[in-house]
Amino acid sequence: MFVAGKSIPKIGEIRFGYASDDESRLITHKYVGVHPYLVVSNNTYNKTSGQCEVIPFTTKRIGKYNPVHIEYKAGEVRGLIKDSTLIIEGRDTLRNCQLSEPVGEFTEGNWERVVEAMKVQCPFLRKESTDSTVLTIA
């Protein structure tokens, strides 16, 4: 049974979340049901908007190599008790009430792999530019 958390999610936390498929008549690629999620939105957004951006983990074997799927062994990340894959292209927005209390958190070393995969998924994050409309992550 899923129990919603009362604390405001913080970036880097791993929380279980419940996502329902509101468009149940359509075939979607959203991860529905209860899954562990990595919180990736900033703390100010999480606090003021009542929602946060998350990336789902799955324990299913994905098969072929994909640069935006990051595999973690059980225990490699505090809070993951099974081998898991972080699915970068599954990034979604959930309401804070759809997330449990934190079950783990990412370290600096874990973030490096996520940032590199995000650059592959969103190539505009790699561009060096003086244009203020382009976001640069170095």
What label would you give each PLM region?
Residues 7, 72-138:
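C-terminal terminal-subdomain/extension
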Residues 15, 52, 70, 85-86:
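A broad, low-specificity signal marking well-ordered, structured residues that form hydrophobic/aromatic
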Residues 2-8:
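Short, surface-exposed secondary-structure edge patches
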